């Protein structure tokens, strides 16, 4: 019997790097909402009293970027007396956006391999490799450690926003360690929560008393509600439970650490449980395959698992800049597939169109901001881009595709042929 512990982490929306991801995606939303053909590569940096957006934009949209940035920072919770050195109203906002390189644009506008099909005309915005993953550990078909870490982080933000724990401040991190036996989760080994807070907590100022108070409150108002509907729940007697291990966490957010877009790519995806191609998502329009193809790879992997063709599936895609069709497609089922990896790969090539133009069209990636009141990508920028029951994400909706894959497998069995 194999037994091991796997750990994943998440961060709250007030973490400096996540502030940047949300600002970058708010810029993307605003531009696409006005001009769905906008080309965007927006990077954000924050530090004490400063937020700067930079990168490349080609768009007909007219956006008040300074006002937009301040609104995002304020919505997260950095405003007023509790802002702690990073206030939405008073922080400096710098805008340094240029136009996209025409050398890049020509390959995206007119793919090298197009042959009359309009979807062939949209080339990949860059070369690269992307991975998608799914497994049957949770209802959303995500690995349990990252799913739990996100649940805790979302709940931590919720009890701050609704005033349940009014001493909490925006910055925070969660981490969950899960025990596996024979590749199945059997026990929650450790829960770690680090959360920013006011210097005084419910009238307490002694560091140990403050820490104890926060620990008890978080177990009651964060851990228990976040795990209430799960079959595998933390046992306080046996689960190692750590809160603010350094003792206190008063100075946080951009006052404590600088933040950058794209520095939480493992939090954004599968918590390290699957491989990652290295490309970040936030601030990038759908022609950037770092984003759109990673969404498609998740869609493929989730459909394979939902169809019962594998208990675990990892899909690798690769692209060349200016070329529409993927350079390569590979499926790995880690021995859990009903058929071989080669047959699963053939099935994917037969049933999925993974050209950038087709991905963009299927998921309506250019129209999503305008279809959702001007805000879509920003909501993916915190608490993960995959396995989000709180969001209506098109790449998570695999019901019809899973049904067609099931039928294809049934037809194969009936005919006695390989896929």
Curated annotation (Swiss-Prot):
Annotated segments matching region Flexible loop: 100-110
GO biological process: one-carbon metabolic process; S-adenosylmethionine biosynthetic process
Major subcellular location class: cytoplasm
Catalysed reactions listed for this entry: L-methionine + ATP + H2O = S-adenosyl-L-methionine + phosphate + diphosphate
Protein residues bound to Mg(2+): 17
GO CC field: cytoplasm
Record localization: Cytoplasm
Gene3D superfamilies given in the database record: 3.30.300.10
Keyword list, A-Z: ATP-binding, Cytoplasm, Magnesium, Metal-binding, Nucleotide-binding, One-carbon metabolism, Potassium, Transferase
UniProt binding sites for L-methionine: 56, 100, 257, 288
Known EC number: 2.5.1.6
Binding-site residues for K(+), renumbered to this chain: 43
Top-rank taxon: Bacteria
UniProt xrefs under SUPFAM superfamilies: S-adenosylmethionine synthetase
Annotated cofactor note: Binds 2 divalent ions per subunit.
Gene Ontology MF terms: ATP binding; magnesium ion binding; methionine adenosyltransferase activity
UniProt entry tagged with the keyword Ion transport: no
Pathway as given in its UniProt record: Amino-acid biosynthesis; S-adenosyl-L-methionine biosynthesis; S-adenosyl-L-methionine from L-methionine: step 1/1
HAMAP family assigned to the protein according to its UniProt record, in alphabetical order: S_AdoMet_synth1 (MF_00086)
Annotated function: Catalyzes the formation of S-adenosylmethionine (AdoMet) from methionine and ATP. The overall synthetic reaction is composed of two sequential steps, AdoMet formation and the subsequent tripolyphosphate hydrolysis which occurs prior to release of AdoMet from the enzyme.
Entries under NCBIfam families matching the protein: metK (TIGR01034)
Quaternary structure annotation from Swiss-Prot or TrEMBL: Homotetramer; dimer of dimers.
Name of this protein: S-adenosylmethionine synthase
Lineage, top ranks: Bacteria, Bacillati, Cyanobacteriota, Cyanophyceae, Synechococcales
Annotated gene: metK
């Amino acid at each position: 019997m194999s037994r091991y512990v796997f750990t994943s982490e998440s961060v709250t929306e007030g973490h400096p790097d996540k502030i940047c991801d949300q600002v970058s995606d708010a810029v993307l939303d605003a531009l696409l909402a006005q001009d769905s053909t906008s080309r965007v590569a927006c990077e954000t940096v924050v530090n004490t009293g400063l937020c700067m957006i930079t990168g490349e934009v080609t768009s007909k949209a007219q956006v008040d970027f300074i006002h937009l940035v301040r609104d995002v920072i304020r919505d997260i919770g950095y405003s007023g007396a509790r802002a702690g050195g990073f206030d939405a109203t008073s922080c400096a906002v710098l805008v340094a956006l240029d136009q996209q390189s025409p050398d890049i644009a020509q390959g995206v506008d007119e793919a090298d391999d197009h042959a009359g099909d309009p979807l062939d005309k949209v080339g990949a915005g860059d070369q690269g490799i992307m991975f998608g993953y799914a497994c049957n550990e949770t209802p959303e078909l995500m690995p349990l450690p990252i799913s739990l870490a996100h649940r805790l982080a979302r709940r931590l933000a919720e009890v701050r926003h609704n005033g349940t724990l009014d001493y909490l401040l925006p910055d925070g991190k969660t981490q969950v360690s899960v025990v596996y036996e024979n590749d199945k989760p059997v026990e929650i080994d450790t829960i770690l929560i680090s959360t920013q807070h006011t210097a005084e907590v419910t009238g307490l100022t002694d560091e140990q008393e403050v820490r104890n108070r926060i620990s008890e409150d978080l177990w009651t108002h964060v851990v228990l509600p976040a795990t209430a509907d799960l079959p595998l729940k933390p046992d306080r007697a046996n689960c190692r439970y750590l809160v603010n291990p350094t003792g206190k966490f008063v100075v946080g957010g951009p006052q404590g650490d600088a933040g950058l877009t794209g520095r939480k790519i493992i939090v954004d995806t599968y918590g390290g449980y699957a491989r990652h191609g290295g490309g970040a998502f936030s601030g990038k329009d759908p022609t950037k395959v770092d984003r759109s193809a990673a969404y498609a790879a998740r869609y493929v992997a989730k459909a394979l698992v939902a169809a019962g063709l594998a208990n675990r599936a990892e899909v690798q895609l690769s692209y060349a800049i200016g070329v529409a069709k993927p350079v390569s497609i590979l499926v790995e089922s880690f021995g859990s597939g009903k058929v071989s990896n080669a047959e699963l790969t053939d099935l994917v090539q037969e049933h999925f169109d993974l050209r950038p133009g087709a991905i963009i069209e299927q998921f309506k990636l250019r129209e999503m901001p305008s279809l959702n009141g001007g805000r879509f990508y920003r909501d993916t920028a915190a608490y993960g881009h995959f396995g989000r029951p709180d969001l209506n994400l098109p790449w998570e909706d695999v019901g019809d595709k899973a049904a067609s894959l099931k039928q294809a497998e049934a037809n194969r069995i009936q005919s006695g042929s390989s896929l």
